[in-house]
Curated annotation (Swiss-Prot):
GO terms for biological process: bacterial-type flagellum assembly; protein secretion. This is Flagellar biosynthesis protein FlhA. It is found in: Cell inner membrane. GO terms for cellular component: plasma membrane. It comes from the Bacteria. Required for formation of the rod structure of the flagellar apparatus. Together with FliI and FliH, may constitute the export apparatus of flagellin. It comes from Caulobacter vibrioides (strain ATCC 19089 / CIP 103742 / CB 15). It is a multi-pass membrane protein. Its main location: membrane.
Length: 700
């Protein structure tokens, strides 16, 4: 007994979950589709058919009201599914009613149910020819007008929606890259864009169901009339006139009770797909737009009045329309003349009051990176072609993240009327870090050898590197390229300048919050390293200062686990950030040598002579790791001249070498060189990878 009861007990949760799912509506659609399949197979009694026909009529009206009252098509994304299910439901009802008409038609007009009989008598009014004509008119209106029109609208909407997707996607990415929207807002917009394309694509296909339903209704009606007369006359020996009258009444009633919901849902489909360009609900939009123009209303009033005066034409209907349109036109004219009345809330808002003080927090907020454009450069972001600038900024974010492991903050772009017409300014934390001018419609041309461009144009200096350049006309592009010149457009000039400024200020832009984010985004396999290091061995602030020091010398922090391991190795022996950085750089030897190698794969170096090594070592003063450089000014000038001469000779030979020093003096040599040659790389002997191939090109 216990074993027998076990299956029943185990089945109880599944039955309960099935009932709960039905109550929540999760299985309603599945059961509905199963019910439609049952209609196709099992005979349905007339009372049950009456209930199902009432559900069909009521449901179609509900769908139409929903289509009218929604504000945008995406509020009714389930409409294609609803369209398919209701079409199948009507076809199932047609088959069930056909079975009743042909099998019980000899019993009289009530053989197929009270609903079909009532519709048949209501439309025919004792004359079945009238019913046939009305039914044919409904079929023609539904098939030729409503269904065909809504299908065409759905087809065009789907095509244009799919064609516009790339542009809309680019606009979302541009707003995200410039900081106009957040990552969450971008996700919401992308999801809405995907829903829109899917919806209109589904509507394009679903409209074909409505068209097929109209054709099927016409064919089923003809079959019912012809088949019913044959069955009544041949099988049941009914007089031909009685058979024709009885079966026609039931068939027309069946056709009407099926085609009226079909027509209503076809109208709903047209409403949904035609709302793409309408703001708000359809009733408010139509009321506002049709009655807003007094000139149009006046012409309608005059036209109706003229028609009312035609001999034989009934005066009252047209005169009433003329008076109504004229009164509405007069009211619109008067409303336009008098000032708009304010409601109490508006009056309270308009009353003189003390200006609302802006929150202090809004004044404290600053933009990490900002580009200000002169009035003449607004087309760089407002025109369709202007997306090139935002696209390049987005690509720059990816490049900096890939090369340096540095996530560039959002760039805010805005206009500044105080700038020159075609000028721009780049600000880092609200401070101007660079400025320049570009020429829209022209191209910047530069000689890679550093000479002056021998083409007509405006000779200037390239803003990022200060090289000689010339703004040339666009039609000289091919000639400039043929001569071997470098040619770039205005957006690229601005982006290149922004790139160099960001590289110079990466250390300042790496905030404490950004460091915390980098640590959190490390793989799970590295979480133990972070937990062991922070805060037990070093603080997050110390890690931030180490990363800033590396970025200041343009060393990539992408290999963050390796950097943390270097910090963890040196931290027990020193608290000096300088010494921590030196230890980390030694662990990054492979990366440093690879990043600074020449075209031939060798690392070009300029060595520091023994005299200068000794001079720097003797000039270090202070206890422990907190040493300071105290080099006499005269010796400092000699060193600067020596560095310049050595690197200029290397540049003439086509080399871009690094300065190689001993580990003890490297940070102090770098602190001097960054003042006059910020991009020069200074490496110590500990940072040379054992497999690196060196090429000495000079000595200081």
């Amino acid at each position: 007994m216990a074993d027998a009861a076990a299956p029943n007990a185990s089945s109880m949760p599944s039955a309960k979950s099935l009932l709960d799912g039905l109550m929540r509506g999760e299985m309603g659609l599945a059961l509905g589709v199963v019910g439609i399949i049952v209609l196709l197979i099992i005979p349905v009694p007339a009372p049950l058919l009456d209930v199902l026909l009432a559900i069909s009529l009521t449901g179609s009206v509900l769908i139409l009201m929903t289509a009218i009252l929604i504000k945008k098509p995406l509020e009714f994304t389930s409409f294609p599914t609803v369209l398919l299910v209701t079409t199948l439901f009507r076809l199932g009802l047609n088959i069930a009613s056909t079975r009743l008409i042909l099998s019980h038609g000899q019993e009289g007009t009530g053989g197929a149910g009270a609903v079909i009989e009532a519709f048949g008598h209501l439309m025919m009014q004792g004359n079945f020819v009238i019913g046939v004509i009305v039914f044919i008119i409904l079929i023609v209106v539904n098939f030729m007008v409503v269904t065909k029109g809504s299908g065409r609208i759905a087809e065009v909407a789907a095509r244009f929606t799919l064609d516009s997707m790339p542009g809309k996607q680019m606009a979302i990415d541009a707003d995200l890259s410039t900081g106009l929207i957040s990552q969450d807002e971008a996700k919401i917009r992308r999801k809405e864009l995907e829903q829109e394309s899917t919806f209109f694509g589904a509507m394009d296909g679903a409209s074909k169901f409505v068209k097929g339903d109209a054709i099927a209704g016409l064919i089923i009606t003809a079959i019912n009339i012809i088949g019913g007369i044959i069955i009544g006359v041949v099988q049941h020996k009914m007089p031909f006139g009685d058979a024709a009258s009885t079966y026609t009444i039931m068939t027309i009633g069946d056709g009407l009770v099926s085609q009226i919901p079909a027509l209503i849902i076809s109208i709903a489909a047209g409403m949904v797909v035609s709302k793409a360009g309408v703001e708000g609900s359809a009733d408010k939009a139509l009321t506002t737009q049709l009655a807003m123009n007094p000139v149009g209303l006046g012409m309608v009033s005059a036209s109706s009045g003229i028609i009312a005066l035609i001999p034989g034409m009934p005066i009252f209907p047209f005169a009433a329309m003329a008076l109504a349109a004229g009164a509405l036109a007069y009211k619109r004219v008067q409303d336009a003349k008098k000032p708009k009345a304010l409601d109490p809330a508006d009056l309270e808002a308009a009353a003189p009051s003390e200006p609302e003080e802006e929150p202090i927090s809004a004044s404290l907020a600053i933009d990490d990176v900002k580009i200000e454009l002169g009035y003449g450069l607004l087309t760089l972001i407002n025109d369709l072609d202007g997306r090139k600038l935002t696209d390049q900024i987005r690509a720059l974010r990816k490049t900096l993240a890939s090369e340096y492991g540095f996530v560039m903050p959002p760039v805010r772009i805005l206009d500044n009327m105080r700038l020159a017409n075609q000028g721009y300014a780049i600000r880092i934390k609200e401070m101007e870090a660079g400025a320049g001018e570009v020429r829209l419609g022209c191209l910047m041309c530069m000689d890679p050898r550093g000479g002056q461009v021998e083409l007509p144009g405006e000779h200037v200096r390239e803003p990022a590197f200060g090289l000689p350049a010339t703004w040339i006309a666009d039609d000289l592009r091919e000639e400039a390229t043929f001569r071997g010149y470098t040619v770039v457009d205005p957006a690229t000039v601005l982006t290149t300048h922004l790139t160099e400024i960001l590289k110079e200020n990466m250390a300042d832009l790496l905030s404490y919050a950004e460091v915390q984010k980098l640590l959190k985004e490390l793989p799970e396999t590295q979480k133990k390293l972070v937990d062991d290091l922070i805060p037990g061995t070093v603080t997050a602030t110390t890690v931030q200062r180490v990363l800033q020091s590396l970025l200041r010398e343009r060393v990539s922090i992408r290999d963050l686990p390796q950097i943390l391991e270097g910090v963890g190795e040196a931290a027990p022996h020193t608290a000096s950030v300088t010494q921590l950085v030196e230890q980390v750089r030694a662990r990054l030897a492979r990366q440093l040598c690879w990043a600074n190698r020449g075209d031939d794969g060798a690392l070009p170096i300029i060595t520091l002579s023994a005299d200068w090594e000794q001079a720097f070592a003797e000039a270090l003063i202070g206890p422990g790791d907190d040493k300071q450089l105290a080099l006499p000014p005269s010796r400092l000038q000699d060193f600067i001249r020596g560095v310049r001469d050595s690197f200029e000779r290397a540049a003439l030979a086509g080399e871009a070498p690094v300065l190689l020093t001993s580990p003890g003096v490297r940070p102090y040599v770098r602190s001097i060189i960054e003042r006059f040659r910020g991009q020069t790389v200074v490496m110590s002997q500990n940072e040379i990878h054992p497999r690196a191939r060196l090429k000495t090109v000079g000595m200081v």
